[in-house]
Swiss-Prot record:
Domain of life per record: Eukaryota
Lineage: Eukaryota, Metazoa, Cnidaria, Anthozoa, Hexacorallia
Keyword Disulfide bond set for record: yes
Annotated source species: Stichodactyla haddoni (Saddle carpet anemone)
Protein name: KappaPI-stichotoxin-Shd2a
Gene3D superfamilies per the UniProt record, alphabetical: Pancreatic trypsin inhibitor Kunitz domain
Domain BPTI/Kunitz inhibitor: 27-77
A Pfam cross-reference name: Kunitz_BPTI
Signal sequence annotation: 1-19
PROSITE patterns with a match to the protein in the record: BPTI_KUNITZ_1 (PS00280), BPTI_KUNITZ_2 (PS50279)
Molecular-function GO term, any one: serine-type endopeptidase inhibitor activity
GO cellular component, one term: extracellular space
Family: Belongs to the venom Kunitz-type family. Sea anemone type 2 potassium channel toxin subfamily.
Length: 81
């Protein structure tokens, strides 16, 4: 029984450690959408709501919080529990 309790505690600590893992700094950048002539649907991570959202990228400037797909945004910025 003591071994089972120890393993459960160990699993809990491992889960908490993974859940508090920090996301990359780029995920905290505000979307930078300069006025350019392109029209490219992209995704950025919105830390205020904790999810990836779509925006229109004009094709120039910007920052690294700019993902080609929703999946790429999630894979980079959303830490699984």
């Amino acid at each position: 029984m003591a071994k089972l309790y120890f393993l459960l505690c160990l699993a809990l600590v491992a889960c908490l450690t993974m859940a508090t893992e920090e996301m990359p700094a780029l995920c905290h950048l505000q979307p930078d959408v300069p006025k350019c002539r392109g029209y490219f649907p992209r995704y950025y991570y919105n830390p205020e709501v904790g999810k990836c959202e779509q925006f229109i990228y004009g094709g120039c400037g910007g920052n690294k919080n700019n993902f080609v797909s929703f999946e790429a945004c999630r894979a980079t910025c959303i830490i699984p529990l």
